[in-house]
C-alpha cells in the first residue's frame, strides 16, 4: 500500500500483545502507521496517560515505520486529518467488537468521508486478550507474561515493588 498512512487508536490501558499484533501487521500494510493514544471518557484509567504512552512507545520502538502520538482528548478523525492519514485501522476480536465498530465507522465516515476504515481480525490465539482482562489479572497479581509487551511487565513489577515498600 505505497503512500498509504494508517492510524490505529486506543486507550491502551495497558497495551496488550493483541494490540501489538495489530500494530505489527499494519506496519507491513502501510508506509507509515501512527498509533494514537487517547483517554476514554467512559472509563477510569488504571495507568496514567503518560505511563500508557511510555509503555506503548517502548513496545513499538523496534518498528521503524510506527510512531506513537498522544491525543489525550478529541476525535480520531481529527487527529487523522492533522497527520494526513489515509486509513483508520481497527481491530476486531469478536462480533461485539464488530457491532461497536459499525456505529463508529458510520460517524467517522460522516466526519471524514475521504478517510477509509480498514479492519484487521485478531489472531485466533489473541482474541480473548483485552486490556480490561489484563487489568483484572494485574489487580490480583496474576501472571501476565505472554499477554502484554515486556514494557508493561516491567512497569507492573515496578508498581508491585513500590506497593511492597508502602
UniProtKB/Swiss-Prot annotation:
UniProt main location, coarse: cytoplasm
Residues that hold ATP according to the record: 11-12, 19, 91-93, 101, 126-132
Gene source species: Streptococcus equi subsp. equi (strain 4047)
Designated name of the protein: Phosphopantetheine adenylyltransferase
Enzyme class: transferase
Required co-factors: Mg(2+)
KW Nucleotide-binding (keyword) present: yes
CDD domains linked: PPAT
Subunit-level organization: Homohexamer.
